Amino acid sequence: MLYYDEINNGNLNLEDPYILEGHHFEEGGPLYEYYGPGDVIDLRTLLADMIQFSDNTAAHVLYQSYGGWTTYRRDALQYASHDVDDHFFEPQNYLTSQYTNDLLVYLYQFQDEYELLLNDMANSFPTEYLNETMPYSTFQKHGNYNIYYSSIGLVLDDNPYAISVLTSLGTRGKIHIGQINQLVNEYIN
């Protein structure tokens, strides 16, 4: 959300170029497959790929360009209403459902400022993860790394809610994410 704020404040433009460097590349996502070191890619593509495909290369470029991991994470705390522990700053991308729900509640409260982000979340695997068994569309950001499959999202239909499902169940976790969202949806509605 930091980059979307910078765009909204006029400090950045979606067309701004970023140079991909060798140390940015991580497996998974389209950037790793279709671009190489030295290629130039615009901010819009980086943001879209990071959200829609959970592209780690795009995320790496963005947090490095923001001032590095620690600066990026420190500034991201502005969206949290709860304290985080020291693990939050470790490079393993440690997250808790409390922190991710804080992000989602903030996003819900300021939806008009994050239309582009919500659009990308709507296009993130619309039939998988939180959306796998849902009667409504969930605006989601998913991720998977080793045995960790996770997804966070907003359901804006009927009775809106935020949901964060973080698993360590391998590929089984991906299936359970959608089932949990469906159960929550049935309970709320």
List PLM regions with ranges.
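Short glycine/serine- and small hydrophobic-enriched flexible loop segments
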Residues: 1-9, 64, 102-109, 182-186
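Active-site SXXK
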Residues: 1-18, 50, 163
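Short alpha-helical "patches" and their helix-cap loops
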Residues: 14-22, 73-77, 113-123
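Acidic helix-start/capping segments at beta-turn-to-alpha-helix junctions
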Residues: 15-32, 67
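Active-site-proximal beta-strand/loop segments in catalytic clefts of secreted hydrolases
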Residues: 21-23, 50-54, 62-66, 141-144, ...
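Active-site-adjacent helix/loop patches that line small-molecule binding or acyl-intermediate pockets
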Residues: 26, 34-116
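Structured C-terminal helix/loop/strand segments within mature extracytoplasmic catalytic/sensor domains
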Residues: 92, 108-126, 141-189
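Active-site-adjacent substrate-binding region
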Residues: 123-137
